[in-house]
Curated annotation (Swiss-Prot):
Cofactor list: Fe cation
InterPro entries documented for this protein: Mn/Fe_SOD, Mn/Fe_SOD_BS, Mn/Fe_SOD_C, Mn/Fe_SOD_N, Mn/Fe_SOD_N_sf, SOD_C_sf
Top class in the EC scheme: oxidoreductase
Name of this chain's protein: Superoxide dismutase [Fe]
A GO term, aspect molecular function: metal ion binding
Catalysed conversion reaction: 2 superoxide + 2 H(+) = H2O2 + O2
Induction info: Expressed constitutively, although partially repressed under conditions of iron stress.
Gene name per UniProt: sodB
Alphabetical keyword list: Cytoplasm, Iron, Metal-binding, Oxidoreductase
Subunit structure: Homodimer.
Membership in a protein family: Belongs to the iron/manganese superoxide dismutase family.
């Protein structure tokens, strides 16, 4: 069974008032994400991995030098689908309930979390991702290079930000810190993060 690209969870122009152009999604979703899906299907066709879940393909191919292409494409399919759900028109603000309490417990305050997350995203050299994860019941900020994600480290992803240049260049050019601030202030879908925590 072929892997498929889920639809965006919002119209491609929905985030324009919040700093992300429809053109960004034409390229980022329409070309980059779509290409990862196409490449993954070509790489696993006729192999036992074809029938696995995307998560299992990621876990089984990680660290296997003969399956680098499979891992990179599978992880990027998963990462992007997860990232789109982390975005919401008019998002940002503050989380509530258990999520807010866990963030306060782990980081001291929402502002301290934002500072740590922003630092992770800004200092990821080259391409990669910044994450908020549940690591055995404790919330942590982490960052991963290229396609890597927390699933391969036994962590539960709660929130991510794509810091590959193609994620922000049309909107923010080389100003990655401005992209990060805009994400935290205007786009974070805290409802999705809370669902991930509760799952």
């Amino acid at each position: 069974m072929a892997f498929t690209q889920p639809p965006l969870p919002f119209p491609k122009d929905a985030l324009e008032p919040y700093g992300m152009k429809a053109e960004t999604f034409d390229y980022h979703y329409g070309k980059h994400h779509a290409a990862y899906v196409t490449n993954l299907n070509k790489l696993v066709e006729g192999t036992p991995m074809e029938s696995l879940s995307l998560e299992d393909v990621i876990k089984q191919s990680f660290g296997d030098s003969s399956k680098v292409g499979v891992f990179n494409n599978a992880a990027q399919v998963w990462n992007h689908t997860f990232f789109w759900n982390c975005l919401k028109a008019g998002g940002g603000g503050a989380p509530t309930g258990e999520l807010a309490a866990k963030i306060d417990a782990a980081f001291g305050s929402l502002d301290k979390f934002k500072e740590e997350f922003s630092n992770a995203a800004a200092t990821q050299f080259g391409s990669g991702w910044a994450w908020l994860v549940d690591d055995g019941g404790t919330l942590k900020v982490t960052k991963t290079p290229n396609a890597e994600n927390p699933l391969v480290h036994g962590q539960k992803p709660l929130l991510t930000l794509d810091v590959w240049e193609h994620a922000y260049y049309l909107d923010f050019q080389n100003a990655r810190p401005a992209f990060i601030k805009n994400f935290l202030d205007n786009l974070v879908n805290w409802d999705f993060v809370a669902q991930n925590l509760a799952a």
